[in-house]
Amino acid sequence: MLGAKAWAENRTDEDISRIDAFLLVDMIGDADLKIYRTFPPYVGDEEGDRLWGAVRTLAGPLGLIDNVTDCGGNPGLDIVNFSTTDGVFDDHVPMIDVGIPAIDFIDIRYGENASVWQGYWHTHEDTPDKVSAESLAHIGRLLELGLREGSWLKVQVNQTEPMQHQEEAQASTFGPVVIGAVFTVIALIFVGFLGLHESVRLKR
């Protein structure tokens, strides 16, 4: 985590303000892939809830949630599951410490029926044949869909606001426009009256 800490601490305030999300992808190649919500960020953290909420929203249509039908009409797999939360201090934590919204995609039960931080993790059994291309693809598609949909971006200004401001602007100019029109009509009537009066006077 030293490299992540050094990187985070070297970001300027301007750098940090321009980063909408830091998505750490760590240990997601397990054939028996299970992605649980990790903390920090803790439940109730606004940015953490936003990002994990996006994960849940994206995972359903991709078929990564058990008993949720995917966009192709197929039953979902039990891959993304928020019934359990795991405490994991990983390379995303230094980002959170400096104010960058960050979450961690990680399967800390590496191997079939493995318990927390057990299985093949940090053993000689952690070999390339244990890595599942399908599992990597599942997370890759989720991340890509999130990018395409703008799901990782911070909450944007409500798009109805410009229209609201436009209506307010129209309302604020309506009064002066009406008053101006009324004065114009009065002026025309007055000019017409003067012209008529002058015409009558000349005839006399």
Range-by-range predicted roles:
Residues 24, 42-84:
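Acidic, glycine-rich loop-and-strand cores that form catalytic or ligand-binding grooves
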Residues 1-54:
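Acidic/histidine-rich catalytic neighborhood of metal-dependent amide-processing enzymes
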Residues 111, 174-176, 200:
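Short, aromatic- and cysteine-enriched interfacial helices/patches
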Residues 187-204:
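C-terminal membrane-anchoring or membrane-association module
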